[in-house]
């Protein structure tokens, strides 16, 4: 027989961002618990609101499956003494399994007999096992915790109710002094405490108390209500996925409504309006059918339509205060001078161990100038980079960015344009923040891209220099994201700037404000971010071989990894890698970069390999380059089959090593082939 199990944890309001990962974690840990305890089930359904986390296990077995496992013990010669009695080793082994020596039998394994015991355990009724659910609830982890009353135990929020039902039977458990039962809570304002009749009636019982327990159902309700508003008013609403996810985890009974604001505020930059509505008030933005912003918004109430007009007015009033602030800052900021704001950056701390924002900006300016040379930009682009790098942080001291920090860079572009800066400079001021997430949008302009890379490089090197290096998952200064941005931008624009040489050259810069330190750590950190750029399907040994190549150019490393992974299933791959590995291993014994003397070749195979190496030239197509290299495999094999490299004649040996080194150096621009496994 099977039954349905319901577990609901009733809490005080959780932050919206915690709800979804927490219910997923509960489902996963519940599944592990049931599997570990040999309780089969069909599926686990999830329910969540800001005030509850619940799962329903469908068709849970009413009894554990029986358990039987064989255990191998010591060899027979160790298990028995000279008189044939069981030794302490044998007795200790069976005692550790909860058995006696009566359970011992001997089995032959590879010609020798060993002690074996079989442990059988009859399955227990599910009700006896489910007391362990408390351990599951206690094991949940959260990004923030609190403790309350006399409890030393911390949890995301205080727990008020615990429902545990096996079909319609309430189980007696205790969690943080809360006894389980069938009492749950309805909507905070519209509902009341209610009894859950059975696991199967959970959603229905809560719906009667104005709680929609299924997050997907709440999401569908919100979307349907917004679409209905669109039809009624002939408008278009942007349903942002992140905002929708947040809103549905702020409410238990959603009711969408439309509010409005004075049209005069449409004169503000659109980003100010959208940020005020979406980010600060969690409103959905409303546009007309052409995409033009309208003086309206859609919000979602946690409740029904009763007194909805009062809710609309309240939301309009709150938004009005935001828009009035935005209007004030927009007007006042335009009176400021960029030069004055830049000067004031000298008084703004970038980090207490690193210095001011102005000093950071000046270091970035030098790095940007160097990068512009390496990227072969035009004189005009270099001039634009110099200007942008001289001012690009100025908007941090504007009132608008002080109030709406999400608009940093965005407002900088607008204020720079109003101040008469060129479009390229203004755009770079905005784009230098990109990407704002590990896979976010990248700069589109070369000037913005160079400034973004320079800014992130100084940030990375500065924090590493003062010992603020990420460890484990701890990365408070988002240095992984910044470094990922560096390699992604270099890859996008195809700038063939070797990262090892780039970093080495930056460490030669002479700044008054800071001396870069910990170069090896920086290079290792960047290497890790480049590896993230390589497709996850590429085998680890190929990734490592490419990263250990001599190129250190992001685009080429990514393309080389893809090309080698593509070839890995081809018939000639193994032979080609083995040939090149032999070349690499012997080339390590050479003095490197020395000339090859063809006059002392002793056989035709040396000459054939030399000619092939001299004719080996790579193109922009990495797959083609790998093919050009692999086609040399028969020539390499013929050389090794007919030529002893490590001969007694020192000149001949050195010459042959130099020949192999010449090939290895060319091949190493693709990968360190002796690191690729062929078994």
From Swiss-Prot:
Catalytic activity field: tRNA(Gly) + glycine + ATP = glycyl-tRNA(Gly) + AMP + diphosphate
Keyword Ligase: yes
GO molecular function terms noted in the UniProt entry: arginine-tRNA ligase activity; ATP binding; glycine-tRNA ligase activity
Gene Ontology CC entries for this record: cytosol
EC code(s) of this entry: 6.1.1.14
Keywords annotated in UniProt: Aminoacyl-tRNA synthetase, ATP-binding, Cytoplasm, Ligase, Nucleotide-binding, Protein biosynthesis
Stored InterPro entries: DALR_anticod-bd, Gly-tRNA-synth_bsu, Gly-tRNA-synth_heterodimer
Keyword Glycosyltransferase: no
Any GO BP: arginyl-tRNA aminoacylation
Places the protein is found: Cytoplasm
Subunit structure: Tetramer of two alpha and two beta subunits.
Protein family (similarity comment): Belongs to the class-II aminoacyl-tRNA synthetase family.
Protein name: Glycine--tRNA ligase beta subunit
Record organism: Streptococcus mutans serotype c (strain ATCC 700610 / UA159)
């Amino acid at each position: 027989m099977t039954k349905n199990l319901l577990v609901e944890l009733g809490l005080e309001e959780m932050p919206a961002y915690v709800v979804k990962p927490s219910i997923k974690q509960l489902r996963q840990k519940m599944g592990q618990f049931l599997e570990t305890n040999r309780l089969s089930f069909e599926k686990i359904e999830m329910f969540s609101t800001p005030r509850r986390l619940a799962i329903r296990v469908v068709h849970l077995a009413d009894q554990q499956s029986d358990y039987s496992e064989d255990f191998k013990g010591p060899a027979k010669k160790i298990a028995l003494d000279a008189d044939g009695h069981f030794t302490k080793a044998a007795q200790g082994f069976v005692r550790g399994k909860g058995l006696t020596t009566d359970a011992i039998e001997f089995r032959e394994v590879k010609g020798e007999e060993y002690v074996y015991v079989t442990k059988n355990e009859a399955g227990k009724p599910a009700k006896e096992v489910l007391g362990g659910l408390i351990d599951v609830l206690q094991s949940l982890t959260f990004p923030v915790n609190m403790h309350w009353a006399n409890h030393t135990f911390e949890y995301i929020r205080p727990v008020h109710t615990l429902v545990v039902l096996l079909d319609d039977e309430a189980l007696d458990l205790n969690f943080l002094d809360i006894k389980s039962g069938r009492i749950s809570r309805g909507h905070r304002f519209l509902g009341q405490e209610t009894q859950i009749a059975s696991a199967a009636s959970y959603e229905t019982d809560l719906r009667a108390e104005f709680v929609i327990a299924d997050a997907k159902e709440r999401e569908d309700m919100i979307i349907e209500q917004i679409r209905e508003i669109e039809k009624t008013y002939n408008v278009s609403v942007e349903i942002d996925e992140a905002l929708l996810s947040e809103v549905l985890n702020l409410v238990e009974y959603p009711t969408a409504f439309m509010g409005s604001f004075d049209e005069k505020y449409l004169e503000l930059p659109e980003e100010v309006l959208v940020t005020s509505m979406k980010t600060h008030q969690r409103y959905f933005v409303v546009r007309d059918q052409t995409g033009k912003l309208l003086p309206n918004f859609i919000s979602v109430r946690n409740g029904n339509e009763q007194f909805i007009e009062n809710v609309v007015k309240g939301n309009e009033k709150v938004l009005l205060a935001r828009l009035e602030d935005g209007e004030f800052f927009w007007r006042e900021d335009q009176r400021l001078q960029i030069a004055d704001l830049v000067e004031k950056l000298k008084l703004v701390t970038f980090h207490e161990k690193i210095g001011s924002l102005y000093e950071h900006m000046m270091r970035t300016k030098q790095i940007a100038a160097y990068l512009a040379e390496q990227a072969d930009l035009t004189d005009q682009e270099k001039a634009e980079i110099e200007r942008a790098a001289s001012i690009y942080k100025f908007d941090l001291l504007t009132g608008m960015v002080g109030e709406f920090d999400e608009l940093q860079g965005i407002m900088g572009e607008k204020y720079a344009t109003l101040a008469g800066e060129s479009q390229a400079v203004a755009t770079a001021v905005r784009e230098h923040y990109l990407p704002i997430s590990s896979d976010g949008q990248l700069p589109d302009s070369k000037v913005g891209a160079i400034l973004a890379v320079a800014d992130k490089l100084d940030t990375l090197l500065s924090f590493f220099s003062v010992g603020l290096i990420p460890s484990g998952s701890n990365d408070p200064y988002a240095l992984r994201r910044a470094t990922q941005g560096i390699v992604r931008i270099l890859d996008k624009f195809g700038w063939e700037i070797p990262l090892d040489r780039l970093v080495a050259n930056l460490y030669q810069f002479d700044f008054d404000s800071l001396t870069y330190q910990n170069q090896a750590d920086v290079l290792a950190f960047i290497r890790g971010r480049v590896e993230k750029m390589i497709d996850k399907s590429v085998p680890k040994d190929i990734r490592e071989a490419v990263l250990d190549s001599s190129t250190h150019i992001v685009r080429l490393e990514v393309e080389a990894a893809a090309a080698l992974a593509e070839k890995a299933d081809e018939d000639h791959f193994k032979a080609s890698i083995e040939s090149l590995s032999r070349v690499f291993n012997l080339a390590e014994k050479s003095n490197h970069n020395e000339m090859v003397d063809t006059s002392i070749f002793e056989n035709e195979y040396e000459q054939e390999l030399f000619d092939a190496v001299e004719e080996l030239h790579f193109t922009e197509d990495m797959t083609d380059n790998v093919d050009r290299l692999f086609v040399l495999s028969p020539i390499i094999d013929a050389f090794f089959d007919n030529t002893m490299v490590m001969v007694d004649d020192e000149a001949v040996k050195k010459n042959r090593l130099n020949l192999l080194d010449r090939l290895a150096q060319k091949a190493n621009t693709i990968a360190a082939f002796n690191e690729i496994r062929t078994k």
